[in-house]
């Protein structure tokens, strides 16, 4: 899951980025309001963590512009503004959730997962395809009921494909979902991850659509 984080507090921002990255999220972090606002137009983010008190542009104005321009990515407001009227205003401007500081990182992760379930119309964290089960919240994968060991990028790729079962995902989109701007990406990175997953799940689990990208095979 690729997350856009807009937070000007260096200690908080670094803690969120580091912690979520260890949990398997890909996080792009911006400290300036306007830069963060423009970033959403440049990459396919799954969700946004947005502070309200930002240099350059207030978080409420950022959110208002996004919604007016049709950006529908789920937004979690994370702020020290805890007054009832502030929370109500944020939600009415188009935020999908509102969490006040101080916070526990595990709750931030849980709320992001809940936003993704809501976006995808899912009632449970568990994703299933054939005899493969994936629980992104618990970072658990099983094959025919047996534990499956996956590297972080393999887990992220499998989650992406399972969340989009029935769709062909272009290679470029997969690359953008798996990697942040500050990560080096080799030209065959996606192909390598697909190869490793096929070795663990079976050669037919992921199907190549030549000239386009990848999709899950038949169940």
From Swiss-Prot:
Residues 2-116 form the Response regulatory domain. CDD domains: REC_OmpR_PmrA-like, trans_reg_C. Induction: By the AI-2 quorum sensing system. Member of a two-component regulatory system QseB/QseC. Activates the flagella regulon by activating transcription of FlhDC. Currently it is not known whether this effect is direct or not. One of its GO terms (molecular function) is transcription cis-regulatory region binding. This is Transcriptional regulatory protein QseB. GO terms for cellular component: cytosol; protein-DNA complex. It is found in: Cytoplasm. The keyword DNA-binding applies. The modification 4-aspartylphosphate is found at residue 51. The keyword Transcription applies.
């Amino acid at each position: 899951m690729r997350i856009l984080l807009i937070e000007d507090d260096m200690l908080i921002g670094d803690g969120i980025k580091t912690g979520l990255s260890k949990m398997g999220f890909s996080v792009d972090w911006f400290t300036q309001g306007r830069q963060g606002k423009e970033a959403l137009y440049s990459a396919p983010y799954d969700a946004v963590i947005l502070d309200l008190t930002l240099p350059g542009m207030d978080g409420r104005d950022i959110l208002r512009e996004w919604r007016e321009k049709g950006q529908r990515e789920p937004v979690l407001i994370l702020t020290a503004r805890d007054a009832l009227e502030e929370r109500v205003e944020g939600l009415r401007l188009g935020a999908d959730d509102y969490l006040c500081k101080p916070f526990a990182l595990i709750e931030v992760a849980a709320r992001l997962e809940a936003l993704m379930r809501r976006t995808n119309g899912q009632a449970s964290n568990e994703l299933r395809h054939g005899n493969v089960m994936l629980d992104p919240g618990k970072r658990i994968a099983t094959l025919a009921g047996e534990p499956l060991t996956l590297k972080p990028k393999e887990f992220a790729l499998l989650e992406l494909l399972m969340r989009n079962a029935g769709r062909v995902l272009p290679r470029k989109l997969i690359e953008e979902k798996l990697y942040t701007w500050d990560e080096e990406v080799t030209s065959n990175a996606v192909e390598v991850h697909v190869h490793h997953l096929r070795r663990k799940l079976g050669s037919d689990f992921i199907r190549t659509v030549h000239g386009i990208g990848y999709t899950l095979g038949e169940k």
